[in-house]
């Protein structure tokens, strides 16, 4: 899985690239609103006082490791000391439903990309063309029925609306990306 943009050395570099690349192309189905001022101007600027939601548990409601919980608590204290309003709040997202919807959408799109690439090469796609994990995703994507894909998109849109309502009250959510510290590099093998 990946996230599209740039690899940079600093937030300032990323902000400059966002200034160069933000905005929708004609015909894009979705577009973020234009920023009020350049992203680069935001780097180092003092933010207004923010209302921040804190989730000191996993997104699935499970407890965090002591190390992750301490990091969230320490960061919440720092933000409070900086004058922000920090309070426990959870948008109440069904992470299992979101996971199923994401998996269906990502798998179907992965299958489509691999199929289109193989078509451009004039042959059928095979597991020899991609990593084992990608091929497994292709197989899963080929099994996603049209109505299931449509429902997955609907679920993501409902999630988006729910989060949109939540962010009417909060500027951001402080939460750990994982319940435990990340696995060491090399632990996961996408070839098997």
Language model feature labels by segment:
Residues 13-16, 71-74, 78, 151-158, ...:
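A non-catalytic, amphipathic alpha-helix used as a structural packing/dimerization or gating element
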Residues 1-75, 93, 116, 124:
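A short helix-breaking turn/cap at a secondary-structure junction
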Residues 82:
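Conserved dinucleotide-binding and phosphotransfer motif residues
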Residues 85-90:
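General small-molecule cofactor/ligand-binding pocket signal
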Residues 63-64, 98, 183-186:
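Short glycine-/acidic-enriched loop or helix-start segments at secondary-structure transitions
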Residues 41-56, 105-164, 177-189:
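Short helix-loop capping/hinge segments that flank enzyme active sites or metal/cofactor-binding pockets
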């Amino acid at each position: 899985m990946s996230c599209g943009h740039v690899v940079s050395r600093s937030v300032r570099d990323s902000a400059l690239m966002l200034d160069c690349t933000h905005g929708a192309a004609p015909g894009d189905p979705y577009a973020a609103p234009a920023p009020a001022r350049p992203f680069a101007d935001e780097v180092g600027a003092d933010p207004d006082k923010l209302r921040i939601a804190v989730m000191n548990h996993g997104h699935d409601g499970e407890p965090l490791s002591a190390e992750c919980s301490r990091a969230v608590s320490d960061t919440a204290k720092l933000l409070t000391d900086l004058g922000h309003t920090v309070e426990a709040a959870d948008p109440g997202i069904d992470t299992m439903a979101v996971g199923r919807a994401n998996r269906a959408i990502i798998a179907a799109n992965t299958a489509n990309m691999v199929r289109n690439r193989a078509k451009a090469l004039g042959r059928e796609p095979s597991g020899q063309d991609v990593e084992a994990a990608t091929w497994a995703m292709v197989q899963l994507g080929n099994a996603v029925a049209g109505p299931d894909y449509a429902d997955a998109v609907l679920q993501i849109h409902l999630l988006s609306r729910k989060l949109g309502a939540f962010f009417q009250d909060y500027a951001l959510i402080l939460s750990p990306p994982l319940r435990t510290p990340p696995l060491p590099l090399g632990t996961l093998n996408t070839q098997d």
